[in-house]
A protein has these predicted regions:
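Flexible "cap/lid" loop of the alpha/beta hydrolase fold
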Residues: 161, 168-224
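Active-site loop/oxyanion-hole signature of alpha/beta-hydrolase fold enzymes
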Residues: 102-167, 171-176, 341
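Short beta-strand/loop motif that positions the catalytic acidic residue
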Residues: 288-289, 295-297, 301
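Conserved HGGG/HGGXW glycine-rich cap/lid loop of the alpha/beta-hydrolase fold
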Residues: 54-116, 154
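Catalytic active-site module of serine/aspartate enzymes centered on a nucleophile-bearing elbow/loop
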Residues: 314-374
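An N-terminal hydrophobic leader/cap segment in hydrolases
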Residues: 3-47
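Conserved alpha/beta-hydrolase catalytic His-Asp/Glu region
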Residues: 218-287
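Acidic catalytic loop of the alpha/beta-hydrolase fold
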Residues: 276, 299-304
């Protein structure tokens, strides 16, 4: 146990200088001191049953002006987080009028307010099946745009592998355009997170500290939870360094990250580690060739370094690669203006294509009606 705590300390010690520097600048006003981070009330909540019966918590947000939505946006959150991590996207996209969007955010199994699942089902394959269940239940018709952060992005890739018909164009499936018109892959990876040629990631089954925590969580889960809760400033410094970039970070954001991380049991988190080690979904990226794709990542991301996003964009070909300078892994929390402006561009592209498609269909129907009434 002392070795484990020492290992955690070693990670956090590297953050000490950064934390002290932030502390010296702490006199400046916290821009999010009064922001209700993660506490925006949804318009509706519900539960979707996964294919194995696991209950998945779902929150819906309608357009703020009460107008009719043109697109359904589904947010797929990252490892150890919850739907609450989409706070700024949920807030800002609700105000959109061009296009109006209906937002759907859900918690992965064994995360947040969703049901706990068997460790054997803690796989990206199962998460993709869960996402498919959410789409069927919450967006049975109409265009969809998927937002995937970190493990959520991996889940979207696996969905493309399991159900390519959701993404493929009329030329491929013969039944009209796929339901998924756009995808945002945020701070994620398509290949195994510890693969050669890219920076070694902490989200790796090869990391000895991760394995140590996993073994201890299985042997004495209450002890691990206690150590995590009692970590205090040590844990806060580590989270500050690993989740965010090197710039001025709102203390409220760091507190919010800690709150998110503490919402999922260590035992549940550790059960997902092997699926990261097995993650290799570059072949699935070809399915996005006829989908609008935005690949967004901070170049100070320590968990899924920017090289991963570069490779994803290169493999897709037509994807837009967005480099957010100085931002870390939680780029959508740290730099919401940069991320949201790109998401709005993506949504507007998808809406324009949908408008053109409907116009073509309407024109065709009009010509047919004229032919029959001659």
């Amino acid at each position: 146990m002392l070795g484990l705590i020492g290992g955690v300390g070693a990670v956090a010690t590297g953050a000490a200088a950064t934390a002290l520097a932030v502390g010296r600048r702490g006199a400046r006003e916290d821009p999010y001191a009064h922001e209700p981070l993660g506490d925006l009330a949804p318009d509706r909540t519900s539960t979707v049953a996964a294919d194995d019966g696991t209950p998945l918590y779902v929150a819906e947000v309608d357009p703020a002006d009460g107008g009719t939505p043109e697109i359904t946006v589904i947010g797929v959150h990252g490892f150890a987080l919850s739907a609450r991590s989409w706070h700024f996207q949920r807030r800002d996209l609700a105000a959109l009028t061009m296009p109006r969007v209906r937002q759907v955010y859900y918690d992965h199994r064994s995360h947040g307010r969703s049901g706990r699942a068997d460790p054997d089902a803690a796989t990206i394959e199962q998460l993709a099946a869960d996402l498919h269940a959410v789409i069927r239940a919450m967006a049975p018709e109409g265009p969809v745009v998927l937002l995937g952060h970190s493990m959520g992005g991996m889940t979207v890739m696996e969905l493309a592998q399991q159900a390519p018909e959701l993404f493929e164009s009329v030329a491929r499936n013969g039944n009209g355009p796929g339901r998924v018109r756009g995808v945002a892959l945020i701070a994620t990876a398509a290949g195994e997170v510890a693969s050669a040629g890219v920076p070694r990631s902490l989200l790796s089954r090869y990391n000895p500290l991760t394995r140590g925590v996993g073994g201890l969580a299985g042997w004495q889960p209450g002890l691990v939870e206690f150590v995590r809760a009692a970590g205090g400033q040590l844990t806060r410094q580590a989270v500050r360094r690993l989740a965010f970039g090197s710039g001025d970070i709102s203390p409220s954001l760091v507190d919010f990250m800690l709150e998110l991380l503490q919402g999922t049991r260590v035992r549940d988190l550790v059960s997902f580690i092997d699926t990261f080690g097995d993650h290799h979904r570059y072949p699935a990226l070809a399915t996005f060739s006829s989908t609008h794709v935005s690949v967004i990542c901070g170049d100070a991301d320590m968990l899924t370094p920017f090289e991963h996003s570069e490779r994803i964009a290169e493999e897709i070909g037509a994807a837009e690669l967005v480099r957010v300078h100085g931002a870390g892994h939680m780029v959508h929390l740290e730099r919401p203006q940069d991320v949201n402006s790109n998401l709005i561009d993506l949504l507007q592209q998808c809406a324009l294509v949908e408008l053109e498609r409907r116009s073509v269909i309407a024109s065709f129907r009009e010509r047919v009606m004229r032919w029959f009434t001659r």
